[in-house]
Amino acid sequence: MSNTDTIVAQATPPGRGGVGILRVSGRAAAEVAQAVLGKLPKPRHADYLPFRDANGTTLDQGIALWFPGPNSFTGEDVLELQGHGGPVILDLLLKRILTLPNVRIARPGEFSERAFLNDKLDLAQAEAIADLIDASSEQAARSALNSLQGVFSTRVNQLVEALTHLRIYVEAAIDFPDEEIDFLSDGKIESQLNGVMADLDAVRAEAHQGSLLREGMKVVIAGRPNAGKSSLLNALAGREAAIVTDIAGTTRDVLREHIHIDGMPLHIIDTAGLRDASDEVERIGIERAWQEIEQADRVLFMVDGTTTQATEPEQIWPEFMARLPKTLPITVVRNKADVTGETLGIEDVNTHSLIRLSARTGDGVDTLRDHLKQSMGFTSNTEGGFLARRRHLQALELAAQHLIQGKEQLVSAYAGELLAEELRLAQQSLSEITGEFTSDDLLGRIFSSFCIGK
């Protein structure tokens, strides 16, 4: 399939609706307009017209919008046909358009891809379109819109520009030693480099917040049977998401619930009680529980406060702790404070946090919510923030590593050539975010995840 073909796709979701939109982009868009509408609409004006088949029979009637390139979303000629949202009507109109020469169905994300290739959007802005559609909270939607409007790209471009100026100075001093620019010892380069590194750290912190808004946090509730895991899931979800009984082993499979804490998505997973089970179904559930635990961002180790006074997880259940990944964050939750009479609250016990609460009554659950938010470094003040993806975080981290290595070359070895190379690599990593330096394979993976009509 060629990028010079004219493409068409339904821009509205499949199924019945009040309005259905077909979008056409490419060189033959004007021919499509003449064939279906009998005329070329006035640019950027809404025309109410019949949509006709090859025999001149009216298939539907609705609004036609004409956006001649390059002043369009894709940078090409674009035609939008807004008719009634019946699947049969839209299918007939789509088939009519596809009978015309050099017109084909668009690939997923191809409209946004063409906007990127025609310099109407950079890559971060194009990704923000999909993120805006998929936003699961108001804050995520606002941050995605900020990214679409170029907030993230501007921050990245400022870093790239600063690195460019720094590289010019360093490489000029290397290429013209007779000018006696003592850039290595006068401290000017190191000062500028420190400034860029500080700015990069600030962008990384904002990107981390944006990633939390987009990706959320995966929290697994684990522990012995009847510790109150399902009750805690229900308390956090604010509804009866899981069945709760006094019978050990009631939960036999993984239960998932998605909530928000001040805008941050939280993926809570309730698991089967961990024990040596004789029942085959329960054993499968326990194995799935361990799979979820190993992939978690944090584990809530649920403890029945009526069965032990211990507060350190290694004392409560050493076998459980021995199997956990060493770097996995743990929060010990002593449940049933309404029975034991323990004081509600949170405290640090060695390397773990300990929370006392009652999942049944809900007392102390707000403390747990605050703890989860703080443990991920999430702040609810995201005014002017932007969304970020994992690849963005990786690119920012790689750029930071190159700057650290470059500074080491400057401070310890006075190696200007090596410093210049690290600056170049850092600039290249940042340019991958906006698509200034990006492989075709990466572009294919990004745009293939979009909707067909986007």
From Swiss-Prot:
CDD domains, A to Z: trmE, TrmE_N
SUPFAM superfamilies in alphabetical order: P-loop containing nucleoside triphosphate hydrolases, TrmE connector domain
Amino acids binding Mg(2+): 230, 251
UniProt-recorded name of the protein: tRNA modification GTPase MnmE
Protein family (similarity comment): Belongs to the TRAFAC class TrmE-Era-EngA-EngB-Septin-like GTPase superfamily. TrmE GTPase family.
Positions of GTP binding: 226-231, 245-251, 270-273, 335-338, 358-360
PROSITE patterns membership: G_TRME
InterPro entries in the cross-refs: G_TrmE, GTP-bd, GTP-bd_TrmE_N, GTPase_MnmE, MnmE_dom2, MnmE_helical, P-loop_NTPase, Small_GTP-bd
Family matches, as NCBIfam families: mnmE_trmE_thdF, PRK05291.1-3, small_GTP
Sites where the protein binds K(+): 226, 245, 247, 250
Stored Pfam families: MMR_HSR1, MnmE_helical, TrmE_N
Domain TrmE-type G: 216-377
Species annotation: Pectobacterium carotovorum subsp. carotovorum (strain PC1)
Entry cofactors: K(+)
Principal location: cytoplasm
Complex and partners: Homodimer. Heterotetramer of two MnmE and two MnmG subunits.
Gene Ontology cellular component annotations, sorted alphabetically: cytosol
Cofactor notes: Binds 1 potassium ion per subunit.
Superkingdom as given in the UniProt entry: Bacteria
The enzyme's E.C. designation: 3.6.-.-
Sorted UniProt keywords: Cytoplasm, GTP-binding, Hydrolase, Magnesium, Metal-binding, Nucleotide-binding, Potassium, tRNA processing
Main EC class the enzyme belongs to: hydrolase
Residues noted as binding (6S)-5-formyl-5,6,7,8-tetrahydrofolate in the record, renumbered to the chain: 23, 80, 120, 454
Protein's cellular compartments: Cytoplasm
GO molecular function: GTP binding; GTPase activity; metal ion binding
Function: Exhibits a very high intrinsic GTPase hydrolysis rate. Involved in the addition of a carboxymethylaminomethyl (cmnm) group at the wobble position (U34) of certain tRNAs, forming tRNA-cmnm(5)s(2)U34.
